[in-house]
C-alpha cells in the first residue's frame, strides 16, 4: 500500500470536515506526485485528537515523515526529520506544499 492509499483509508473516518477536506486534498496531490520508493520500508502510525488535529507519521531508522492537519488550516504542517536535519513547512496551497514536501523528502533521503 502506498502512502496516499494509507492516508485515504484513515481520512474516510475523520469526522471534522475541515481536517478531512485538507487531508483529502493533500492525499490526492500526493497520489498524483509521489514516488512510492520514498516511503519504502517505513512503519506507519496514525494519531488523532479530533476535532483539533490528526497526524500521519512514517518512520524508518532516523527518518521521520509527518503530516499534521489541524482544525485551523493555517496551522497544518509537514515535517521531515533525518538524523540532525529537520525541515518543516506549512500546508497552505495544497499542490505547492505537496511538491515542496516531496522534493524535500527526496533530497533528505538521497543525501
Regions found by a protein language model. Give the residues of each.
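Active-site beta-strand termini and strand-to-loop segments that position acidic
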Residues: 56-60
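Intrinsically disordered, low-complexity regulatory segments enriched in Ser/Thr/Pro
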Residues: 5-8, 62-96
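Exposed alpha-helical structural elements
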Residues: 22, 97-100
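Membrane-insertive, pore-forming/entry segments and their flanking low-complexity regions
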Residues: 88-91, 100, 109-111
Amino acid at each position: 500500500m502506498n502512502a496516499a492509499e494509507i492516508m485515504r483509508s484513515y481520512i474516510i473516518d475523520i469526522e471534522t470536515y475541515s481536517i478531512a477536506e485538507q487531508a483529502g486534498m493533500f492525499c490526492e496531490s500526493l497520489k498524483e506526485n509521489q514516488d512510492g520508493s520514498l516511503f519504502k520500508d517505513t512503519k506507519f502510525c496514525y494519531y488523532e485528537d479530533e476535532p483539533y488535529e490528526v497526524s500521519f507519521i512514517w518512520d524508518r531508522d532516523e527518518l521521520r515523515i509527518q503530516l499534521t492537519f489541524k482544525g485551523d488550516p493555517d496551522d497544518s504542517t509537514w515535517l521531515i526529520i533525518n538524523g540532525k536535519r529537520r525541515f518543516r513547512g506549512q500546508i497552505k496551497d495544497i499542490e505547492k506544499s505537496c511538491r515542496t514536501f516531496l522534493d524535500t523528502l527526496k533530497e533528505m533521503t538521497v543525501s
